[in-house]
């Protein structure tokens, strides 16, 4: 008996619907191993770098109007980057109440420098800058609830 694409599609569909975490299928020279990621949160998380968070990208067609051309006398454009939250949680600007805040407007940040903490499920996750630059705006207040992907700070690069 040959395994067809249809058989594989049916199998993958069943695995998605059921509570199957691991599946190993071996037939002659064909071998398939499926491992679903666990939905459990690791208990020993201390620091989470936002560079390790991946977002799914949906393909869409977007019509973007052409940019207006700038005159020669206009100011050169400034580059900005945004530090975003890699998770849902509570934003804190200092390691503990009453302690010195990590960064404030006007501070120069370096790559991998801790800029804030996001508390998620009673775990304090240090959020680090992925770029160097000057903090020009902090977009959330201490104690605010933030969503995954929400902008936290604006950095001039």
UniProtKB/Swiss-Prot annotation:
UniProt cross-references to Pfam families, sorted A to Z: Biotin_lipoyl
GO molecular function, a single term: acetyl-CoA carboxylase activity
Gene3D superfamilies, per database record: 2.40.50.100
InterPro entries: AcCoA_biotinCC, Biotin_BS, Biotin_Carboxyl_Carrier/Decarb, Biotin_lipoyl, Single_hybrid_motif
Listed GO biological process terms: fatty acid biosynthetic process
GO CC annotation: acetyl-CoA carboxylase complex; chloroplast
Signal sequence annotation: none
Modified residues (N6-biotinyllysine): 122
Subcellular localization: Plastid, Chloroplast
Residues covered by the Biotinyl-binding domain: 80-156
CDD domains from the UniProt entry: biotinyl_domain
Source domain of life: Eukaryota
Keywords from the UniProt entry: Biotin, Chloroplast, Fatty acid biosynthesis, Fatty acid metabolism, Lipid biosynthesis, Lipid metabolism, Plastid
UniProt pathway annotation: Lipid metabolism; fatty acid biosynthesis
PANTHER family linked: OXALOACETATE DECARBOXYLASE ALPHA CHAIN
Functional summary from the UniProt entry: This protein is a component of the acetyl coenzyme A carboxylase complex; first, biotin carboxylase catalyzes the carboxylation of the carrier protein and then the transcarboxylase transfers the carboxyl group to form malonyl-CoA.
Stated name of the protein: Biotin carboxyl carrier protein of acetyl-CoA carboxylase
């Amino acid at each position: 008996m040959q395994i067809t694409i249809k058989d594989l599609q049916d199998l993958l569909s069943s695995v998605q619907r059921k509570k199957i975490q691991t599946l190993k299928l071996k037939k002659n020279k064909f071998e398939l191993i499926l491992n679903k990621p666990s939905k459990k949160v690791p208990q020993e998380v201390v620091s989470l770098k936002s560079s390790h968070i991946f977002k799914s990208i949906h393909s869409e067609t977007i019509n973007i109007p052409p940019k207006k051309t700038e005159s020669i006398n206009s100011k050169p454009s400034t580059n900005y980057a945004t530090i975003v939250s890699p998770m849902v949680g509570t934003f804190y600007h200092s390691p503990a109440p009453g302690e010195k805040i990590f960064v404030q407007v006007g501070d120069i940040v370096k790559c991998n420098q801790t800029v804030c903490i996001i508390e998620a499920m009673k775990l304090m996750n240090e959020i680090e800058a992925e770029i160097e630059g000057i903090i020009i705006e902090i977009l959330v207040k201490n104690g605010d609830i933030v969503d995954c992907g929400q902008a936290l700070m604006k950095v001039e690069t």
